[in-house]
Amino acid sequence: MKQKKYAKMLYPSPIGTLSLIADKQYLYGIWVQDQTHFERGLGDETIEEVAGHPVLEQVISYLDTYFEGSVQDLSDLPLAPIGTDFEKRVWTYLQAIPYGQTITYGQIAQDLQVASAQAIGGAVGRNPWSILVPCHRVLGLGNRLTGYASGVEKKAWLLQHEGATFQENKK
């Protein structure tokens, strides 16, 4: 069986180095280096670090614009999810959360008619496209800052960058 080959570019961002991975046609992920679920699902596939790549250059342009404080529509960017049908359903829902706005895990569970907000949290945590599919816009009960695969301090930075409102957790 032939091994799949992926291209990888690293992107320095205000929240840490991002690992961007695609094949010739699809974006497979944007991960903060060493986050939970880092490069999940790629297995023993060949990943080659490259200096340029058409899909990844489109993502870099988006990230540059995002970190400068504005957004662009990337709905036509070809995403290739590696996950369960349930996870894919949650990730599709996340894409509709507008810049600078938030929603709770419980509200997503209610909207998707899922009994458990924790199940939603698990799927949100395995989102392979940090920032692009905005899992950082999902908050806990009472709009509290909770879980983020690369750390809640990075989630707080992204939400503040977007001007979103949230409740800090008391220590």
Predicted regions and their residues:
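Basic nucleic-acid-binding alpha-helical/helix-turn surface characteristic of O6-alkylguanine DNA
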Residues: 1-114, 161, 165-171
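Major-groove DNA-recognition helix of helix-turn-helix-type DNA-binding domains
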Residues: 124, 128, 132
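Short Lys/Arg-enriched helix C-cap and helix-to-coil transition segments
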Residues: 132-139
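Helix-turn-helix DNA-binding helix
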Residues: 119-120
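…primarily DNA-binding HTH/wHTH and HhH modules…
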Residues: 141-171
